[in-house]
Amino acid sequence: MKGFACLALLALAVPAAAQEVASAGGAILRALDKNTGITEDLDVLAGGSVDFGRLNVTVSDCRYPVDDPTSNAFAHLDIADRRSGKTEFSGWMVAASPALSALDDPRYDVWLLRCKTS
């Protein structure tokens, strides 16, 4: 039993291997207007912004695993209501888990599809 406990503690002490990531030039997002059912893919350069309905979406950074650029992208987004000026979302969105960190808006959904690598 002591051997198992020591092995478990050793396993916890060894840090997980970090996955190498790269920054992309922008992000591909999908936006949905829940009232009209209209979806639009938004191509946003890093540091740039785009309007969708009453929202203004800004992409600060988009990162992806070097070994697998088509999956597990994550982007830092700021989403503001253009009418009120209120920030609706500010943080990292993860393409593989859109519900993990999502925009909470009664009319619009915005989620990350992938980083723009070309």
Range-by-range predicted roles:
Residues 5-10:
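Hydrophobic helical h-region of N-terminal Sec-dependent signal peptides
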Residues 2-4, 17-118:
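N- and C-terminal low-complexity/disordered segments
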Residues 13-15:
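N-terminal signal peptide c-region/cleavage motif recognized by signal peptidases
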